[in-house]
Amino acid sequence: MFGWIHESFRQLVTRKYGKDIWEKIVHMSKFELGTESEIAHYYNDDETLRLVNSMANVIGIPIEEIWEAYGGFLIQFTMETGWDELLRAMAPDLEGFLDSLDSLHYFIDHVVYKTKLRGPSFRCDVQADGTLLLHYYSKRSGLYPIVKGVVREVARRIYDTEVVMKVQERKQEHLDAFVTEHVVFVITQIENANSTQPKSISSKADSQIDLSTGIYEISSSDFSLAFPYHICFDPDLFVEHFGNFIKKTFPNAMRQETRVTDLLELVHPEVPFSYESIKYYKNSLFVFRLKGLGDIVHNANDEAKTVLLKGSMVFIDEGKYILYMCSVNVTTVRELIERNLHLSDMQRHDGTRDVIMLNQSRMSQVELNRTLEETTKKLKKMAQELEIEKQKTDELLCELMPASVADSLRSGKAMDAKEFADCTLLFTDIVTFTNICAMCTPYDVVTLLNDLYLRFDRLVGLHDAYKVETIGDAYMIVGGVPERCENHAERVLNISIGMLMESKLVLSPITHKPIKIRLGVHCGPVVAGVVGIKMPRYCLFGDTVNVANKMESNGIQCKIHVSETGKLNGLKANPSYVFIDRGNTEIRGKGMMYTYFLERNDRKSVWELCSRPRSGEQTIDGYMELHDQSIYQEEGGQQENLTVENGNSAQNNHNNNNNTHHSGRKLMNGSSVDPGSHHIRSPTCTIS
């Protein structure tokens, strides 16, 4: 169906029920929003029926009521959009209006929009009691309720009267190869209390004025000259006489020997060409195609264009003959050329001449509007695509730096470096990562890191910290930057417990056992700011970064190594933390430092910190599973004797062989740690 119908539906629903209801209807009918009501687009019937069925389901009213309401709104919307004067000028009464609907449909289809509408046909009969019988024919079954809404609204708005419509008969008729629905309505006028002068629905009962003043004879040759396209024929369809154009086109046509069907092929209305059909549709517009007349063919690829005649049937001599008064059905100069016709072929009083010349300017405007609509559609699509790309850019920018910093950069504000007096840093890496890289394919390494880092990222978001960056197997987060907070140490320590637990779920591609990680935590001041223009990064600088990195590199696998300041800040925020005293550890560049291992958080279980459900066979708090070493392969080497800090001095029997200094350690492919910042220089690619 024509896109105007879909646009009318959209206007009806949005005005009465709101935009949200229409969007639900569009979604249910499986249209992409914005493509469901393109005026210049032709939708197939299945798409329109799908839209109407969705309206009935969402709004909750029967489909017949949907069609009837649409019929009434269609007249309202049509009059609002520039067709008001045309509709009011069509006829002096409702009967004449209904008889003119066929020609109006044909005009809209073939002149205004040039679409392939399969519109209905109408004919009206006046009954002796003043009621009207409206015959409605349509190749689309079930749409007759539209007629009820249309007729009632036309009577109310144009003729200031109220009518009642009832279906008298509904049947299926076979016309040629089509099955046509034929519905007969009885239209009765009722009194309108709000109208002072209601108009009659029919003027056929008015008195006839005698205009006879004598007989003025005109010869057949003069008549053929005055009306070059006319054809007169009898009820048996034998030609009686015809105009000069027809005679020139068909020189072998003979009076009372040639049938009209030998010369013309009925195009509109779509009914069998017979005397009975002409009688039924006498008030309709008739369009014929001249048979066997294919005119100018400009090149081998052009299709032959036939001439169409458009006019009306007039019964003369008390119905003994039918006079088809018509003119050539062309509306543009291009159509004239394609049919080898000229303006001079038409009578000077023929309004078709004016239509052709006016259409030259109108068509350029219609084409401009169509181009504008298509351009607007493309611009909307481009705007949507641009918005999607903008969101992707924003997401990428937020991956490179905190959201607050990214917002400032997008707004064009200068971002100066800021000093943070206290924050908590965490570093983690994978034990024997170099060996894993040497023995596995790059794909396995990337899969391993992706699995691990997705788990870490979830924990960072869960506890509201910030991931600074990942390089290779090194993962760095910070609490208290860029948003200052009092419990930054608690957040990071909780994340470290979750990281250690989550790492047990990631398997090494070599041993197929859980990987082992080291974690280091330290608190202190840092300076943070955006570095770079083309590839901006949010970086942290200061000795705190170096010490936090040393906590990780001097730690022990599957342990959370915490500095003195890290422990103090953690207990200040949450006294329920339990630390194991490691004792003095020599840190390159810092000398001896007293450090600790984080054992547990008595306030929260591991399952709470990881935001994972506990299975029935697992312990309530999960710390036995957190420190379970049996899941790893047995390894040699003396273990540290660790004492839980309980107010007494702890004996540190730490084996110096396990206290190897890792500051400035070599990474894969010869890369090394820069002891002055968190940046790890590596010739390998960065995996984020």
Curated annotation (Swiss-Prot):
Activity regulation behaviour: Regulated by molecular oxygen, which binds to the heme binding site. Probably not activated by nitric oxide (NO).
Cofactor entry: heme
Keyword Iron-sulfur annotated: no
Main location: cytoplasm
Residues given in the record as heme binding sites: H105
Catalytic activity: GTP = 3',5'-cyclic GMP + diphosphate
Keyword Coiled coil: yes
EC number, UniProt record: 4.6.1.2
InterPro entries given in the database record: A/G_cyclase, A/G_cyclase_CS, H-NOX_domain_sf, Heme_NO-bd, HNOB_dom_associated, HNOB_dom_associated_sf, NO_sig/Golgi_transp_ligand-bd, Nucleotide_cyclase
Compositional bias annotation for Low complexity: 646-659
Top EC class, one word: lyase
Gene Ontology terms: cellular component: dendrite; guanylate cyclase complex, soluble; neuronal cell body
Gene Ontology MF terms: carbon monoxide binding; GTP binding; guanylate cyclase activity; heme binding; metal ion binding; nitric oxide binding; oxygen binding; oxygen sensor activity
Single GO BP term: aerotaxis
Subcellular location: Cytoplasm; Cell projection, Dendrite
Tissue: Expressed in URX, AQR and PQR neurons. Also expressed in ALN, SDQ and BDU neurons, and variably in AVM, PLM and PLN neurons, pharyngeal and body wall muscles, and the excretory cell.
Region (Disordered): 644-688
Domain Guanylate cyclase: 424-552
Family: Belongs to the adenylyl cyclase class-4/guanylyl cyclase family.
Other information: There are two types of guanylate cyclases: soluble forms and membrane-associated receptor forms.
Assembly with partners or alone: Heterodimer; heterodimerizes with gcy-36, and possibly with other soluble guanylate cyclases.
PANTHER family named in the record: GUANYLATE CYCLASE SOLUBLE SUBUNIT BETA-2, SOLUBLE GUANYLATE CYCLASE GCY-32-RELATED
Protein name in UniProt: Soluble guanylate cyclase gcy-35
Gene behind this protein: gcy-35
